[in-house]
Amino acid sequence: KENGLDKNTVVIYASDQGFYLGEHGWFDKRWMFEESYRTPLLIEWPGVIKPGSVNNDMVSNIDLPETFLEMAGVKVPSDMQGRSMVPILKGKTPSNWRKEHYYHYYEYPGSHMVKRHYGISTEQYKLIHYYYDIDEWELYDRKADPQEMKNVYTNPAYTSVRKNLHKRLTKLMKKYGDSEELAKSFLPN
């Protein structure tokens, strides 16, 4: 305050992903379950963000560089994978803002012993594929099952949801230059 920085300084509090303390039978992190998937992000931007406001749009750590560049008035390179959050921070979420997240964890076998997996998370659903020495799919309805304890992948009531998520997952993998073939290329010999 003494130097007036409280009037023109953006303050951001973010964290690494959450850490399991026995949820789902695990310790550590890296899994796609909400306990380690969701991370805090608090931003104060004097004169721009309304104090005390809350936004639930899907943002990602890959959006931070683009956001910082736009805040600084620097042109964002077109080959970056994230999107600037500035419109959201100003209370004007773009109509084409993401409705899902893509996640891929490659480091198995390894010291953490977290199985290789990738998936898609939407506001209501999460589809996860475990691979390498297994081939297992999981689907969670986060509104009906917020703790993600009941896998409904084979439940006939979720057939259309499952098919839709598979299509969206394939589209995201292409968007980010990922594929099952690429994932398999990381497997040890």
Describe each model-derived feature in a short phrase.
Residues 33-37, 57-60, 77, 81, ...:
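Short acidic-hydrophobic sequence patches enriched in Asp/Glu that either
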Residues 17-23, 62-65, 70-138, 142, ...:
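C-terminal cap/loop subdomain of S1 sulfatases and analogous C-terminal strand-loop tails that border
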